[in-house]
Amino acid sequence: MDNPKNQNSISRYVKLEDYKVFDYEIPEIFLDFVIKKNFVNVTTKLKLVKKNKNTRNLILDGTDILIKKIFIDDSLLEEEEDYKQQKNNLKIKNIKKDNFLLKIEGRIKPKENTSLLGMYESNGMITTQCEAEGFRRISFHADRPDILSKY
């Protein structure tokens, strides 16, 4: 049985009564990895479609990712004004579009990742472990089982 206090556990358990439908669909995802000696540059493109037209903010899961740049439909976003990165997520503010392409250029450090989740280095080999909730250590995403996307 899983232990919610396990050091590799990223988030608390979600009870059925606490479940909320995600406000966006993510029908397509494109990932590009540039692997260097001490880091990996990850470019993520998410096609997003609002399900709830009243939604203004987008919150994506992500841990230990350095943000280089963020774009919505080729428009560069400004930190603090347009988005805010917190310890375990990224909040993109005041999105007016119902259908858009979100591009995030980020950097991760597999050698420093000791969680055995996401992308990490083990015995000189780059390895990935995305289930459960490990993908959020590779790229910002709605890292939950009800989001199905074409990669």
Predicted regions and their residues:
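Acidic/His-enriched low-complexity segments
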Residues: 1-151
